[in-house]
């Protein structure tokens, strides 16, 4: 296999979040991740250990999606989800902030939530929907 052929794939993130995946579909996705040398995966808490097991020695960063897609979880639940992600061996957090705070002009609460999460042990990526930000 020509390594340069898949060089761009190392910058692409695979997303495994479908709650209706069969185990066969899940394994097909993981095999494609290995085949195309995908290096980043965004997934749910439920899939972290299965992704790690299925990918074996394939070097990949597994990021957990928190508060996605609605951005409406209570802070205590978010904190527990992040702790669980850490325990399961996730490499990062992808977080959808509570934009509702901004609509109520509560920028400080919005920023405080993000600050608390950013102090955890994992790198943090914020998810923004550009179309909703206009």
Question: Each predicted region: which residue ranges?
Answer:
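Conserved, mostly hydrophobic/aromatic
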Residues: 13, 51, 85
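Alpha/beta catalytic cores of nucleotide-metabolism and tRNA/nucleoside-modifying enzymes
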Residues: 1-27
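Active-site-adjacent beta->alpha loops and helix N-cap segments on the catalytic face
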Residues: 43-61, 72-79, 100-118, 132-134
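Non-catalytic positions within long, well-ordered alpha-helices that form the structural scaffold/packing
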Residues: 34, 86-89
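Electropositive, surface-exposed helix/loop patches at the edges of structured domains
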Residues: 5, 102, 124-134
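Conserved alpha/beta-domain cores
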Residues: 18-28, 33-54, 60, 64-66, ...
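Hydrophobic faces of well-ordered beta-strands that scaffold small-molecule active sites
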Residues: 8-17, 39-43, 60-68, 91-95, ...
């Amino acid at each position: 296999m020509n390594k340069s052929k898949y060089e761009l794939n190392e910058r692409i993130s695979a997303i495994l979040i479908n709650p209706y995946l069969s185990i066969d579909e899940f394994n097909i996705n993981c095999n494609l991740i290995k085949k195309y040398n995908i290096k980043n995966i965004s997934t749910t808490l439920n899939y972290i250990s299965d992704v790690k097991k299925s990918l074996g020695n394939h070097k990949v960063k597994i990021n957990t999606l928190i508060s996605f897609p609605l951005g409406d979880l209570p802070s205590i639940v978010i904190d527990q989800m992040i702790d669980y992600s850490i325990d399961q061996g996730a490499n990062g957090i992808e977080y959808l902030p509570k934009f509702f705070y901004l609509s109520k002009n509560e920028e400080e609460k919005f920023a405080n939530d993000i600050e608390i999460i950013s102090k955890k042990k994992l790198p943090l990526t914020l998810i923004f929907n550009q179309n909703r930000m206009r």
